A protein has these predicted regions:
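Bacterial N-terminal signal peptides
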Residues: 1-2
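Structural motif
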Residues: 163-177, 268-269
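Acidic/histidine-rich, surface-exposed loop or edge segments in extracytoplasmic proteins
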Residues: 88, 110-116, 141-165, 253-263
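Long, acidic, intrinsically disordered low-complexity segments
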Residues: 100-142
Length: 598
């Protein structure tokens, strides 16, 4: 039976009575014709910075032609060496001395101006030369390679009948020693390795060094050793690492060696367990040993990891700052058994090299983020006044290695989503669901700052750089949490809070996109501001705002697999990004240039 159509006046009556609800429901129930799909461009991911094959500086032959051909100065004033330098200068003819370009330039500039010996008095090397040679020979004390600075010193005896040969020997020794001293100063000042040639993650300003002025200073200084050693970093951490290096070289290999791949769970047995129990007793403190003395003694020969030992293992893990899960695995073994002596020596030498890339004085106060340790420390007066766990970048999104200066704190911040995350992670979702950003609490703006609905954009036409800015509004789900601490840099890295607090319980904390998540962001903000934590809490409670930092606070986003604490104890860490091997390859490449085989 067919129903009669509803008269128009009756339909209008129902619409007036029910507010158009019938019509709206009918319209909602009607599915629009699907839009013709638009062609989607191919997505091109934004790649992370890369590591490079290290290319060391080459050595060039020093040209002494200008020195040799320069006319002798006509002067009635006696020279410091009685004119011996000019008498000997011809000995540089055909002298094959190799040096870096800046060293070669400093040599010819200094001796072109001064035309006098620094390292020779009369017809023999002087005391200043002897002191310089001793310093160069002790380069290993600073983690350098003595062979890089070796110089043949002329014998004290010579024949007066062979003065031309003696003069040639002395002038060549003069130039060779000056070249090696300048190489030493160059290495001590800024390191052998240029960090920016290692990878796109390394970002250090060039440390200015006037090598001609170094020679000018050495020509007059009374304490060659003090001057040369002052070219190394002059901070307490460098000094502690030097002491550690000396102690390691004098030490024996580890007397208790444990399988580094051990994985022992409760209820299982292993011949490695007695070794670990011995290490728990030795590598903790008196309070720990007293509390667990009975169990350590009764179980010292047991290979069975039974339930009564679980609290002991957890306590030992907590003592070392590890996650107390009761599983004796590689990180627990590394924390107690340590690495081989050779591995620790290498890590200390890498640390000494990396410190040379930094300012000699790290400043007070400063913030030191050590990525392999997963820690951030506020340091004032060489004391670690605040230290906390951090989360750093995943291996695919590594945190860069650089330093900067803290400028601002944002409370209840917006999160400006980096282009790499928009393209690599958000675009695939937006292809399927253009309204995704609207629903997830993000704002989209164009280049002129105008707000645009995410659903109104044809995301399919963008495969690489997206011409829109995306930011997440403040709130409990905001990726930056309550605050962020800014030190503007080209890597878009900063310190911030996070809603993902559970990650701080992990031992290995490389989970972010590169920024540094703080376990105690309020504490760090209070330290940076030199204010109480309550002040920071009040600022957070007041809503979104920013506050400038009015004092100089350097921040070091650093990478050290060996680093000393304030009490002089050096801790060793896993090479989470495999950067130690990159430094070693660079050092090998440099050695091949400086000391070619054959």
């Amino acid at each position: 039976m067919m129903m009669a159509p509803v008269p128009a006046d009756a339909q209008n009556f129902f619409e007036r009575l029910f507010g158009g609800g019938i019509k709206e429901r009918r319209e909602r129930d009607v599915r629009p014709e699907p839009a013709k799909p638009k062609k989607r461009v191919k997505r091109v991911k934004i790649s992370a910075p890369s590591y490079y094959a290290y290319r060391p500086d080459k050595l060039e032959k020093v040209s002494f032609s200008d020195l040799i051909e320069a006319p002798r100065p006509a002067s009635f004033e006696p020279s410091l060496d009685g004119g011996l330098f000019d008498e000997a200068i011809g000995g540089l003819e055909d002298f094959d001395l190799r040096a870096y370009q800046d060293v070669a330039a400093a040599l010819t500039a200094h001796y072109g101006d001064k035309r006098a010996f620094i390292w020779v008095s009369g017809f023999s090397p002087n005391g200043r030369a002897a002191e310089a040679v001793r310093v160069l020979g002790a380069a290993a004390d600073f983690g350098l390679e003595p062979a890089d600075y070796a110089v043949t010193v002329p014998a004290p005896g010579f024949s007066m009948d062979q003065m031309a040969a003696r003069n040639a020997e002395l002038i060549r020794f003069e130039m060779a020693l000056s070249a090696k001293v300048l190489r030493y100063v160059r290495d001590a000042w800024s390191g052998r390795v240029d960090p920016n040639r290692l990878s796109g993650y390394h970002d250090f300003p060039k440390k200015p060094l006037d090598l001609k002025k170094v020679l000018d200073r050495l020509a007059h200084t009374r304490d060659v050793r003090a001057y040369l050693e002052s070219r190394h970093p002059q901070n307490e951490r460098f000094a502690v690492l030097r002491v550690e290096l000396e102690a390691l070289r004098a030490s024996a290999e580890n007397d208790i060696v444990v399988d580094p791949k051990l994985l022992l769970r409760p209820g299982k047995s292993s011949p490695e367990l007695p070794k670990m129990l011995a290490l728990f007793a030795r590598e903790t403190d008196e309070a720990f040993r007293t509390e667990h003395a009975a169990l350590l003694e009764s179980s010292k020969d047991s290979e069975l990891y039974d339930e009564q030992l679980v609290p002991l293992v957890k306590a030992a893990q907590a003592f070392k700052g590890l996650r107390a899960d009761g599983i004796i695995g590689p990180r627990t073994v590394a924390a107690f058994a340590g690495e081989s002596r050779a591995a620790r020596i290498a890590k200390v030498e890498y640390a000494l090299e990396r410190l040379r890339w930094h300012p000699s004085d790290l400043g007070s106060p400063h913030v030191f983020i050590n990525q392999p340790a997963f820690t951030a420390t506020y340091v004032e007066g060489n004391r670690d006044t605040l230290s906390m766990r951090v989360v750093v970048g995943k291996k695919s999104n590594q945190t860069s290695f650089f330093y900067d200066e803290i400028e601002q704190i944002d409370y209840n911040p917006y999160w400006g989503v980096p282009q790499s995350i928009i393209v690599n992670e958000m675009l695939p979702k937006l292809y399927r669901d253009p309204a995704y950003l609207d629903r997830a609490g993000y704002e989209v703006t164009d280049a002129r700052g105008r707000r645009i609905s995410s659903s109104a954009i044809n995301w399919g036409q963008y495969g690489g750089k997206v011409p829109f800015n995306v930011r997440q509004r403040p709130g409990s789900s905001n990726a930056l949490g309550e605050l962020k601490i800014l030190f503007p840099n080209k890597h878009a890295i900063y310190m911030h809070d996070t809603p993902s607090k559970n990650l701080f319980e992990r031992d290995t904390r490389a989970f972010s996109h590169g920024c540094v998540r703080l376990a105690d962001p309020r504490g760090m903000a209070a330290a940076v501001l030199d204010k109480p934590v309550d002040y920071v809490a009040a600022k957070i409670g007041a809503g979104h705002s920013s506050e400038k930092i009015t004092r100089k606070i350097p921040v070091y986003v650093a990478y050290f697999t060996a680093w000393p604490d304030q009490d002089g104890k050096v801790d060793y860490h896993a090479d989470v990004y495999d950067r130690d091997s990159r430094v070693q390859k660079a050092l090998d490449a440099i050695a091949a240039v400086r000391q070619p085989a054959g």
